[in-house]
Amino acid sequence: MNTRNPDKVVIVGGGTAGWMTASYLKKAFGERVSVTLVESGTIGTVGVGEATFSDIRHFFEFLDLREEEWMPACNATYKLAVRFQDWQRPGHHFYHPFEQMRSVDGFPLTDWWLQNGPTDRFDRDCFVMASLCDAGRSPRYLNGSLLQQEFDERAEEPAGLTMSEHQGKTQFPYAYHFEAALLAEFLSGYSKDRGVKHVVDEVLEVKLDDRGWISHVVTKEHGDIGGDLFVDCTGFRGVLLNQALGVPFVSYQDTLPNDSAVALQVPLDMEARGIPPYTRATAKEAGWIWTIPLIGRIGTGYVYAKDYCSPEEAERTLREFVGPEAADVEANHIRMRIGRSEQSWKNNCVAIGLSSGFVEPLESTGIFFIHHAIEQLVKHFPAGDWHPQLRAGYNSAVANVMDGVREFLVLHYLGAARNDTRYWKDTKTRAVPDALAERIERWKVQLPDSENVFPYYHGLPPYSYMAILLGTGAIGLRPSPALALADPAAAEKEFTAIRDRARFLVDTLPSQYEYFAAMGQRV
């Protein structure tokens, strides 16, 4: 048996997944591993305006990229939270922010809020970020300093950790919005400058050896391209993993019915409209609409289930929602494959991106899945014996992340008090994963903590579950009975401190538009 260490990686497919993978692997392994990326010049990518988790900054830090280098090239803006609009009732909104939950006397502040909150806005009472979002503030001052100074110096943060190792230690206060195609273009230049070979060609066939492993891909103009490890970044088609290697796809459609989207890229006068520091998810009759603010435009799209809405109806609803600015903008209709591959790594093929899995755009998990998979590939990169435990570890980590996010998204629909259409009525009777159903019963009397959420790393800390449970409004919750016997004075002091801190930051921070205009960007 050939025990030579694998040192030739072939990535099939470009887009965000392909170029994030290429740039990360090249930075991780340098000249010790050759990386070739093959992408068609004719097959389009799904990428639209993208929103992210705050952990994405670790990706850019790993590549030694500073914000001023990549953000202007990608029309990027800051994201402090997701704003959920009309999920509980028309006109109601709440935020799921990037901000750790405070605790008082051993109980999360949300418990104290349920016991005796100062207002009916849990997000503004328990998080500073909600007020900054309502006021449209940037997380940075005009001199570039961050609202939380310790992160500028990185003195309080452990270095060199993966996302799963960071969770619970710190919470960076923002993520990003950016144009996916522009990020792919930027990372393409970064990767090629560092030795990644770029082949623009169509893959005609995937050839297997007598073991069933991929030996090479056959291209139209460049002939055979061989390698040791092949990375499938071919999107929903899954050309290598699903088609050539026959790995089955595990659908999540029984619990998450949205299977379609229509997207628009709409130029807007951001000086007049401002640049909100959040992703907006607005509930509609048969799904929800995302709004992602970028430099000079918004990315927006209607995510829906075709059993409840036709593509024509969805496009009309989206255009009416955006207004006259969308009149001449071309629509991009997308069929989504919701679920994950049974294995994301089989033999010598690893799927990353949509070929691995996708759990609809709600909560901005697409880029997170890519980033997590790349980190795990480096962590489990094989030696010459291709030890099966490395594949098993990788597959377990990737599956756990997607299954955990699935539970979290199901909670959004099950928990939404909105009940005015057949779609929203059906969200209350649809299948629920057994473990989630058990957890919800516990959360009704004890809010989520690290011991009673999904037990494996999936990028979502307990406070995220608290925000959704409290914000969507359909699941009855009550505080810990112990609080009826506790002194509320310390909690009241904490609520006051949050309100005072929020007022100070709203008064002193610039708006997002003011910040990016001052940075010299053409907004």
Swiss-Prot record:
It catalyses: L-tryptophan + FADH2 + chloride + O2 = 6-chloro-L-tryptophan + FAD + 2 H2O; D-tryptophan + FADH2 + chloride + O2 = 6-chloro-D-tryptophan + FAD + 2 H2O. Keywords: FAD, Flavoprotein, Nucleotide-binding, Oxidoreductase. InterPro entries: FAD/NAD-bd_sf, Flavin-dep_Halogenase_NPB, Flavin_halogenase, Trp_halogen. It is an enzyme of class 1 (oxidoreductase). FAD binds at G14, S40, I43, V46, V48, A51, V203, L354, I367. Gene3D superfamilies: FAD/NAD(P)-binding domain. Optimum temperature is 40 degrees Celsius. L-tryptophan binds at P97, Y456, Y457. Optimum pH is 6. Chloride binds at T365, G366. Homodimer. PANTHER family: FAD-BINDING PROTEIN (PTHR43747), FLAVIN-DEPENDENT TRYPTOPHAN HALOGENASE (PTHR43747:SF4). Catalyzes the chlorination of tryptophan (Trp) at C6 position to yield 6-chloro-tryptophan. Accepts both L and D-Trp as the substrates. The enzyme also uses bromide to yield 6-bromo-Trp. In vitro, can also catalyze the halogenation of 3-indolepropionic acid, N-methyltryptophan and non-indolic aromatic substrates such as kynurenine, anthranilamide and N-phenylanthranilic acid. This is Tryptophan 6-halogenase SttH.
